[in-house]
């Protein structure tokens, strides 16, 4: 057991089924891959994955503080960092392809701005962008329509709010679609990543300089290509 004086920094990872690792039957998801990689580095922060399937911005905003303030070693100190990965569920349109979104872009932008303002007063915050979806297999669960145009609009306001809050932001949506085989990274439901998708996201995250710098890791060797 660790002593009271040698508790490492913690990285809280908050979000939805992506954080949970849904779809990755090989390694448990990109967050689990990150956790295991850092576990093998003695000086790296401890990763706490706190993803809940179906969560959107409002759900995360309601639970983010109580997730860590009363748990184990976390109840005695504020975590050093928080990685936020949420928003895809908010883009879904309900009932039909032109139905109302779970949360419209303006409301999402306002809510994210408020949430980042709260979070950044307590810890270093990082934000992940949104992954693409396979529109051809919609609707999800028979009633939710996801569209890449809506996801792109949502990610754009995420980037804007992060710039205003001076929070590192890692875009995902366009970068994912630029990969020729990205559709093979999807689960049959069209919204969740499979093991290959989680691997790509994890490798992209591993190269992200702001997170590596905060974690005290050496700069990524850019001569090493991403392999699938």
Model-derived features: where do they sit?
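Serine-esterase "nucleophile elbow" of acetyl-processing enzymes
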Residues: 1-53, 58-59, 65-78, 82
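Alpha-helical cap/lid subdomain in secreted, periplasmic
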Residues: 6-7, 39-43, 61-228
């Amino acid at each position: 057991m660790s002593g009271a004086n040698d508790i490492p920094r913690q990285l809280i990872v908050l979000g939805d089924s992506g954080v949970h690792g849904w779809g990755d039957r090989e390694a448990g998801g990109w967050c689990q891959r990150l956790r295991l990689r850092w576990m093998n580095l003695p000086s790296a922060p401890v990763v706490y994955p706190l993803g809940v399937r179906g969560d959107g911005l409002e759900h995360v905003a309601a639970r983010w503080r109580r997730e860590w303030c009363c748990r184990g070693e976390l109840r005695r100190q504020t975590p050093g960092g928080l990685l936020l990965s949420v928003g895809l569920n908010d883009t879904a349109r309900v009932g039909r392809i032109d139905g109302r979104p779970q949360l419209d872009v303006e409301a999402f932008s306002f809510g994210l701005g408020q949430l980042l303002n709260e979070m950044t007063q307590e810890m270093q915050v990082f934000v992940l962008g949104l992954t693409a979806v396979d529109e051809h297999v919609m609707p999800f669960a028979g009633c939710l329509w996801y569209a890449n145009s809506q996801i792109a609009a949502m990610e754009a306001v995420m980037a804007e709010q992060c710039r205003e809050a001076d929070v590192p932001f890692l875009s995902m949506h366009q970068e994912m679609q630029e990969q020729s085989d990205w559709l093979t990274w999807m689960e049959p439901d069209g919204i969740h990543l499979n093991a290959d998708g989680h691997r790509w996201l994890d490798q992209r995250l591993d190269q992200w300089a702001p997170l590596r710098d905060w974690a005290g890791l050496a700069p990524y060797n850019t001569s090493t290509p991403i392999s699938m």
